[in-house]
Amino acid sequence: MNTQLPTAIIGGGPVALAAAAQLVKRNMPFILFERGAYIASSILSWKHVRMFSPWEFNMDTAAKELLMETGWTAPAKDHMPTGVELVNEYLLPLSQLDQLQPFIQLQSSVKAIYRKGFDKMKTAGRDTASFIIEYEQHGKLLREEAASVIDATGTWLKPNPMSTSGHPAEGEIQNKNHIQYGIPDILGADKQRYAGKNIVVVGSGHSAIQSLTLLNELKLENPETTIHWVLRKKKVAEAFGGGENDGLPARGALGTRANQYVQQGNVQVHTPFLIDRIKKESETITLYGTKLDKAYSIDKIDEVIVATGARPDFSFLSELRYAADTSVESVPQLADLIDPNIHSCGTVRPHGEAELRQPEKDFYIVGSKSYGRAPTFLLATGYEQVRSVVAALAGDFKAAREVQLHLPETGVCSVSRSTEISDNSNSCCTTTPKKMSIRPIAVTSMSSGCCSSNNASTSCETDTGC
């Protein structure tokens, strides 16, 4: 590897910045490309959501060391940050350090990565050729040369569609004005969009339950709000997760909370409903599909929230020799550890550079993108990945091999549970707006103690968002 050239980091989220910090600690040059106007721009799309892992698991060691040198005070390790807190209190100060800020390219969308003078077919001399990063910035196509590449772009920007085929349902694209993907700011910026409306949430994971939590609170304030929950699972109890058995209590509480909403009748469940068509009917839409192999539909729907996961984008890697599992689309050696067809939660053993190694020398896919379509990624895993990868790039193979990772047990995430489980710590409060700011970004979050959007947790722990 040409040590005079920088390592190119693609992405500007927590794992990407951790990679930068690790490179700084080893006095290795880097250049980082963030497609958004601000660092960690994808996280700001779920700024209102509280993570279910505390600060202890959300900060990289090398990054903390660099910050501490400036007099920065670390947040309480047992506090669970919201997305805006993650940016405000950690990622933004990190990105503004003198060792990082000059080498961060914002509003830089990477279009292609390839070996200098090589297409995918050519082999002789390939491993010693530098990488070329083609990126668009302010309407111009630019190029940067790099010795190695760390792809930490995550999956947040490529949400899965609502259909079961993996392709958009018929009419899904045409009716996009009625659809939002991920976790909307239901109690904040998007409140008027959902208050008093007939709403469908599609999905069975943490993000779907998070949206149900926020909608349930909205319904307490606006009783005319109607909530439908569409799942592909045969029984709704399969989505309730491990509850008190989960090593992250806030994550376990999500399923308990969802069960409570169903038992109280605040959420109407449709399962297993397989959507294949959406049709506009006057000012509303109708969802068509099958339930237990029979035609089924839900009509007069105002809004749909699709929380069916996300997938990696490989389009800009077409001239590199990369490998991805054929089903999970993860780094191949991780597939059997995280495949949701095999594991309900995916507690993954510690792994590093050796498992992440690609056919293309000095190219690595890390962070949530390394997990492909699997939904169980935690930031602490990504931090250990990049520590090991950077050690290998530095030639410190001993450190790269010594992979150690402390994670909470994920608990039992797919079990048969009694439908009588409930959470007595239900609604208790009303929301009070609180103004928060990130230099130079102004945002508004909701804070209300035990039942605001700040109290509900999710699995938004990806490198560019969640």
Predicted feature residues:
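C-terminal, flexible cofactor-proximal segment of oxidoreductases
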Residues: 311, 326-466
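Glycine-rich active-site loop/strand segments that organize a redox cofactor
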Residues: 36-90, 176, 182-188, 229-249, ...
